[in-house]
């Protein structure tokens, strides 16, 4: 699966389909509910990964945050990286053991 990441626009293009994403260092969040997002500015409370960004990015779909790196203490989600059809009404910071973690399924990261 070939994907191109344009850092300036913060968009991922795959087979002529555009995914709006939120990029924070080496992780990218895609809406779990519709596969899209309304990207503006990432507002993360903590860096999800401490490793530097490397290319190419690897892609994993339909996985839970709990299935990702177990060493990561927390993941973040900006209020603008959620599906625009269902805006969130809570804090946008989920610990790994949060019951709301299932909201974020599609994740692109390196």
Curated annotation (Swiss-Prot):
Recorded family membership: Belongs to the UPF0377 family.
Protein's name in the database: Putative UPF0377 protein YIR040C
Phylogenetic classification of the source organism: Eukaryota, Fungi, Dikarya, Ascomycota, Saccharomycotina
């Amino acid at each position: 699966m070939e994907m191109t990441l344009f850092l300036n626009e913060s968009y991922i293009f795959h087979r002529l389909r555009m995914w709006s994403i939120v990029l924070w260092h080496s992780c990218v969040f895609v809406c779990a509910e519709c596969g899209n997002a309304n990207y503006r500015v990432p507002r993360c409370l903590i860096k999800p990964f401490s490793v530097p960004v490397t290319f190419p990015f690897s892609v994993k779909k339909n996985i839970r945050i709990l299935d990702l790196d177990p060493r990561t203490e927390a993941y973040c989600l900006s209020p603008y990286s959620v599906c625009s059809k269902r805006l969130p009404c809570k804090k946008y910071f989920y610990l790994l053991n949060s019951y709301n973690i299932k909201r974020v399924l599609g994740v692109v990261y390196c």
